[in-house]
């Protein structure tokens, strides 16, 4: 045995001072001194358990002792009666055997291949023993999980990565996937659980038993992220669910991982063979598959970027020429040719490397250089980790650990060790580059593009740095990284085919480069990822954004400006087509062309297909709404024009809905026979409120009443004859139904018909005569106020003329000024008490004192007060033009009318923009103070003072 080097002999004196009495220096062999000097882990362990050292001296580790692990562990577990006892015994057993392995490794008593085998089999033994103990315990508690035939169902565990390949590190976490064969329920328990519940609960307990730190440490860190759907997926899957996932969604990196998958424990049982046969076609393709090279190149690129980003210098696993590159080289051949060459289907690297050489896929010299380098690197890695039982692949920077490694690797000093290491890694890198390297030098633009790809594909953590986000604040940078990570997790839950993932991987770096260049990157990205989640399973939409950069830019700018637009696009992705043409996107339909555009749009849909007609109406509305909002955001539409467009759009929709309802009713009942003597339909729709006043907002509902002029004795002329007035009632009901039916594109509009005579208690549709009579004899003052903002939005000329005459007559009635003033003021005060001031320290733009409703009440009061003297005041139904009329007719001073108009449009503009931001209609108490003071003064002047 090689003597300790000078630095280690000096360190031995420090070790001696730590040793307890039973481990006196003179009682220790030269071997014990060497191992205790090399490994703090062994040192700590034998200080805690001196009997282990005695055992090591009397029964030194053997290469084949892994064959006894299962029996030794069973003996240790035979008296365990609870989970706490199980956890303790597993941890002590793992530590005792790891000390033996470290001893053998440090002294080179066995080959490196034997060390890897022992480490892997130890993990398998512990996992299987824990599983079997817990399975029995869970069956006693919940019953035995069985399939439909009553056959007991086991939990199968796939060991992934180095565990599966029999090449586990000294200090490694373990990657596992849990599966069970068939669905069914437990039998024999106190209550029945389905198999999914049983195995999920058992899986959770198994992870806890292995992973949870206690005073005895842990057994292994357990990583379950390689399972289908990753962290967001079920903990345990049935064979059928596994098969569906890998056939439909399995990705290249999952094929790569599955090469090494090995069933823990009884690997020759019926269910184990079934699982293995099911997975094999996914991993090993029947044809020669050269697409693997690019996939592995991409994966290697991700690793290289991680090394750069995290500053992983001196990393013997991930660095250039490291262990990972040897694994990549071997698995390239397995994945390309494994389906045709069964001899390449081995999980272990070294046997596969021999097959590769035998098949002349690599030269004998290259294969031998890789084999030697692999064993050198793995020994160095395991020695490094055994110093402190620490999961690291980074070479030490301190002199003591460098001296330890140089001695254990049989080199005189650290420079000699690093020289040999460099030679091995250079050989590996050369072979790697010849096979799958991508050594072309990058341009600056390509480098930047690569950084965006890194941001998307490499699952950066919050504390990772990346230059492309350097301009953002620390909070925004973290939020962007979190959003990307959350989006990727969400994708794992979705059924996205290979083509969809390919398109996403092309789209996302471009999207991120555009979004993250903005100062509001975090907010914008949150809106866009929410939208993308809704369309990721529909590759066509992803391709639209990927292939049309201009559409992507419009999407980003609109989503940045308005969460309302982002929400609309997320709910109705068909609207993404609108992004293709900026000429139409930012140019709403002419106000007088909505009806014609809609008519043309509906020609594409069969007239007798009600469902498609309903969808088409909603899709047209949403597309037009998007254009109006886009123009609003771009600043090409002032607030009055926005409302004009929204109002004309609503009128076009009303026209089409009435037409559709009319056709359906006539087909069923025929037409009312009084129409034989006249043209038209004898029907009108009156718009109140914002619709009547040309003041619709983005989310306004429609206040409507329905009128007809059908005589009492009219009947329909169809085969199913009904009373004429009954026909109009059913027509109105049908109209309400067409507006409110929820399709996949939502509802058309919320419709409120409570402003009809007698409100909700009255008939849904009213005759023109009854309406006139009600307004003259029964209506309250507030109903006359509402009439100020009412107009016919659909109807025959003669019914329209009749309504206009009734409206004019009611509004020009002489009224006693003081009484009217009191009634209007008291109604407003009631409204304010009910609706206003709900938010402390906030100003409700519509409902609070000095807001929009006060201006509306002022105009309504003045029209009702003075229209008897000035009938021209009844001409318009919108507030802005009523204010003009009040000034023109010398009722209000022009300066006051203009000031109120400015205040009104300013407040309306703010409401529009709050709607685009999906924010409620209230602002800080200190906003719009000038406008509110002006409105208060006007209110005081007209509705309070004598």
Curated annotation (Swiss-Prot):
Q: Which cofactor does it need?
A: Mg(2+)
Query: Per the record's keyword annotation, is Transport included, yes or no?
Result: no
CDD domains on file: NT_GlnE_GlnD_like (cd05401)
Superkingdom assignment: Bacteria
Q: Where is this region: Adenylyl removase?
A: 1-440
* Sample GO molecular function, one term: magnesium ion binding
Write down the chemical reaction(s) this protein catalyses: [glutamine synthetase]-O(4)-(5'-adenylyl)-L-tyrosine + phosphate = [glutamine synthetase]-L-tyrosine + ADP; [glutamine synthetase]-L-tyrosine + ATP = [glutamine synthetase]-O(4)-(5'-adenylyl)-L-tyrosine + diphosphate
Q: What Pfam families does the entry give?
A: GlnD_UR_UTase (PF08335), GlnE (PF03710)
Task: Map out region (Adenylyl transferase) in residue numbers.
Answer: 449-946
Which Gene Ontology BP annotations are present?
regulation of glutamine family amino acid metabolic process
Known EC number: 2.7.7.89, 2.7.7.42
Arranged from A to Z, the UniProt key words for this protein are: ATP-binding, Magnesium, Multifunctional enzyme, Nucleotide-binding, Nucleotidyltransferase, Transferase
Task: Give the GO cellular component terms, alphabetically.
Answer: cytosol
Q: What does this protein do?
A: Involved in the regulation of glutamine synthetase GlnA, a key enzyme in the process to assimilate ammonia. When cellular nitrogen levels are high, the C-terminal adenylyl transferase (AT) inactivates GlnA by covalent transfer of an adenylyl group from ATP to specific tyrosine residue of GlnA, thus reducing its activity. Conversely, when nitrogen levels are low, the N-terminal adenylyl removase (AR) activates GlnA by removing the adenylyl group by phosphorolysis, increasing its activity.
Instruction: Spell out the family assignment given in the record's similarity comment.
Output: Belongs to the GlnE family.
PANTHER family referenced in this protein's UniProt entry, alphabetically: BIFUNCTIONAL GLUTAMINE SYNTHETASE ADENYLYLTRANSFERASE_ADENYLYL-REMOVING ENZYME, GLUTAMINE SYNTHETASE ADENYLYLTRANSFERASE
Q: What is this protein called?
A: Bifunctional glutamine synthetase adenylyltransferase/adenylyl-removing enzyme
């Amino acid at each position: 045995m090689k003597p300790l080097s000078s630095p280690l002999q000096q360190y031995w004196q420090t070790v001696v001072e730590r040793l307890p009495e039973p481990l006196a220096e003179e009682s220790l062999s030269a071997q014990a001194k060497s191992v205790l000097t090399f490994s703090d882990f062994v040192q700590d362990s034998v200080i805690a358990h001196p009997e282990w050292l005695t055992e090591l001296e009397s029964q030194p580790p053997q290469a084949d002792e892994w064959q006894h692990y299962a029996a030794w562990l069973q003996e240790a577990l035979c008296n365990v009666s609870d989970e706490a006892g199980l956890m303790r015994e597993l941890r002590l057993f793992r530590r005792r055997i790891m000390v033996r392995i470290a001893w053998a490794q440090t002294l080179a008593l066995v080959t490196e291949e034997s060390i890897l085998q022992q480490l892997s089999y130890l993990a398998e033994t512990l996992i299987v023993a824990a599983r079997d103990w817990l399975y029995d315990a869970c069956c006693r508690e919940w019953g035995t999980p069985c399939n439909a035939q009553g056959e007991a169902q086991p939990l199968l565990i796939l060991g992934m990565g180095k565990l599966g390949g029999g090449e586990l590190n000294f200090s490694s976490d373990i990657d596992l996937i849990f599966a069970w064969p068939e669905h069914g329920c437990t039998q024999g328990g106190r209550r029945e659980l389905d198999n999914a519940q049983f195995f999920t609960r058992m899986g959770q307990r198994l992870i806890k038993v292995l992973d949870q730190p206690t005073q005895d440490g842990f057994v292994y860190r357990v990583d379950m992220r390689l399972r289908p759907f990753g962290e967001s997926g079920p903990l345990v899957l049935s064979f059928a669910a596994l098969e569906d996932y890998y056939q439909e969604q399995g990705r290249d990196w999952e094929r790569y991982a599955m090469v090494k998958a090995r069933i823990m424990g009884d690997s020759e049982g019926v269910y184990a063979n079934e699982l293995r046969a099911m997975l094999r076609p996914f991993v090993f393709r029947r044809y020669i598959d050269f697409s693997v090279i690019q996939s592995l190149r991409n994966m290697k690129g991700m690793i290289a970027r991680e090394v750069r980003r995290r500053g992983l210098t001196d990393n013997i696993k991930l660095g250039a020429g490291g262990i990972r590159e040897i694994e990549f080289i071997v698995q390239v051949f397995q994945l390309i040719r494994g389906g045709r060459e069964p001899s390449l289907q081995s999980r272990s690297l070294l046997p596969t490397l021999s097959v590769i050489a035998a098949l002349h896929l690599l030269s004998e010299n290259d294969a031998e250089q890789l084999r030697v380098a692999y064993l050198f690197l793995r020994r160095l890695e395991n020695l490094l980790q055994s110093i402190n039982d620490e999961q690291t692949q980074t070479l030490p920077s301190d002199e003591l650990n460098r001296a330890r490694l140089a001695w254990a690797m049989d080199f005189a000093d650290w420079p000699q060790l690093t020289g040999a290491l460099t030679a091995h890694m250079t050989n590996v890198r050369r072979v790697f580059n010849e096979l799958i390297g991508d050594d072309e030098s990058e341009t600056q633009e390509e480098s930047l593009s690569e950084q965006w790809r890194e941001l998307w594909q490499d699952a950066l953590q919050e504390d990772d740095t990346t230059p492309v986000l350097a301009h953002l604040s620390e909070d925004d940078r973290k939020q962007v990284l979190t959003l990307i990570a959350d989006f990727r997790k969400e994708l794992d839950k979705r059924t996205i085919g290979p083509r969809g993932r390919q398109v996403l991987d092309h789209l996302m770096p471009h999207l991120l480069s555009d979004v993250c260049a903005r100062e509001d990157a975090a907010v914008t990205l949150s809106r866009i990822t929410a939208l993308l989640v809704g369309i990721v399973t529909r590759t066509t939409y992803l391709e639209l954004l990927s292939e049309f950069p201009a559409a992507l830019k419009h999407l980003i700018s609109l989503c940045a400006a308005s969460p309302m637009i982002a929400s609309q696009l997320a709910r109705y992705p068909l609207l993404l087509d609108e992004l293709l043409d900026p000429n139409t996107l930012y140019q709403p339909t002419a106000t007088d062309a909505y009806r014609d555009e809609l008519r043309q749009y509906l020609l594409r849909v069969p007239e007798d297909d009600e469902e498609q007609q309903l969808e088409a109406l909603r899709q047209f509305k949403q597309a037009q709404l998007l254009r109006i909002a886009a123009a609003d955001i771009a600043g090409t539409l002032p607030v009055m024009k926005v409302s004009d467009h929204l109002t004309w759009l609503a009128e076009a929709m009303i026209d089409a809905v009435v037409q559709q309802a009319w056709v359906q009713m006539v087909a069923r009942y025929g037409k009312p026979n009084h129409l034989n003597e006249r043209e038209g339909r004898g029907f009108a729709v009156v718009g109140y409120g914002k619709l009547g006043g040309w003041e619709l907002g983005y989310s306004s509902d429609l206040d409507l009443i329905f009128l007809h002029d059908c005589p009492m004795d009219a009947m329909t002329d169809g085969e199913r004859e009904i009373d004429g007035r009954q026909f109009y009632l059913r027509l109105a009901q049908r109209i309400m139904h067409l507006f409110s039916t929820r399709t996949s594109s939502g509802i058309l509009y919320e419709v409120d018909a409570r402003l009809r005579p007698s409100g909700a208690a009255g008939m849904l549709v009213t005759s023109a005569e009854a309406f006139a009579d009600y307004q003259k004899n029964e209506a309250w003052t507030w109903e006359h106020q509402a009439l100020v903002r009412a107009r016919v939005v659909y109807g025959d000329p003669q019914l329209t003329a009749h309504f206009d005459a009734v409206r004019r007559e009611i509004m020009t009635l002489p009224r006693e000024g003081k009484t009217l003033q009191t009634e209007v003021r008291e109604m407003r005060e009631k409204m304010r008490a009910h609706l206003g001031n709900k938010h402390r320290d906030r100003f409700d733009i519509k409902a609070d004192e000095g807001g929009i409703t006060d201006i509306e009440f002022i105009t309504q009061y003045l029209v009702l007060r003075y229209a008897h003297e000035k009938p021209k005041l009844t001409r318009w139904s919108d507030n802005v033009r009523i204010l003009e009329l009040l000034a023109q007719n010398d009722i209000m001073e022009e300066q006051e009318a203009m000031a109120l108009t400015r205040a009104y449009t300013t407040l309306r503009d703010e409401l529009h923009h709050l709607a685009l931001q999906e924010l409620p209609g209230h602002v800080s108490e200190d906003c719009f103070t000038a406008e509110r003071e002006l409105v208060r003064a006007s209110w005081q002047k007209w509705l309070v003072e004598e």
